[in-house]
Regions:
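Accessory terminal helices/loops
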Residues: 1-21, 103-105, 116-195
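Metallo-beta-lactamase
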Residues: 1-138
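Short, charge-rich amphipathic segments
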Residues: 19-37, 60-74, 160-168
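Alpha-helical interaction segments
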Residues: 26, 83-85, 149
Length: 195
């Protein structure tokens, strides 16, 4: 049974109460003391972590690469259970980042959402993104408005936010907002010549 928007609001209020109590008891924001703008290397014992700033799912996405282990932590740059919401994403750069990752020496991706996969999953994920981009571009070429594209373009449901046995998920109305935000972002970037 889908959750109602009211239930989701109540759930969010419930989840925020502990944070509100922390603020009431003198909690304060402590800014980071170590930052980076492009790349950074960290070591934990003999384990090397390479952090890379990339514009992709967000303007401030971070990839974490463990070269000795040949593991890449991708955040939402790669997801294995559907396409994340693309609202606010840097779509052209995202495709470029996926191309860069093809050249990197690793075997395992730990995605932002979903189970770890082999590097060979990268082309599949990139193709899923490009398919949605082309669906929107095709409809725009046929003169469809954004509202008509909302009605006409559908793709694999956003399984990232759907309810499962283990996870309560978002209500259907919120998932629909994510879908429309994705289509709107693609539409606007194509319209501006950014994609």
């Amino acid at each position: 049974k889908p959750l109602t928007p009211e239930h989701t609001r109540e759930l969010m209020e419930f989840m925020d109460k502990p944070a509100l109590r922390l603020i009431e008891h003198g909690f304060f924001y402590r800014p980071p003391t170590i930052t980076y703008s492009d790349r950074m290397q960290l070591y934990l014992g003999k384990t090397e972590f390479r952090l890379w700033h990339r514009r992709a799912h967000t303007p401030n996405s971070t990839l974490i690469y463990l070269p000795q282990e040949k593991v890449l932590f991708s955040g939402d740059i790669v997801c294995t259970i559907g396409i994340p919401c693309l609202g606010g994403s840097c779509l052209r750069e995202w495709l470029q980042v996926l191309d860069e990752l093809e050249a990197l020496d690793f075997t395992t991706i730990v995605p932002g959402h979903g189970e770890p996969v082999e590097k060979s999953y990268l082309p599949k994920f990139k193709q899923e993104l490009q398919t949605i981009f082309e669906m929107v571009r095709d409809r725009m070429g046929k003169g469809l408005t954004l509202e008509e594209i909302y009605d006409d373009v559908h793709y694999q449901p956003d399984l990232i936010h759907c309810s499962t046995k283990e996870y309560i998920g978002y209500c259907d109305a919120e998932i629909e907002k994510f879908r429309k935000a994705t289509l709107r972002e693609i539409y606007q970037q194509i319209e501006k010549g950014l994609l």
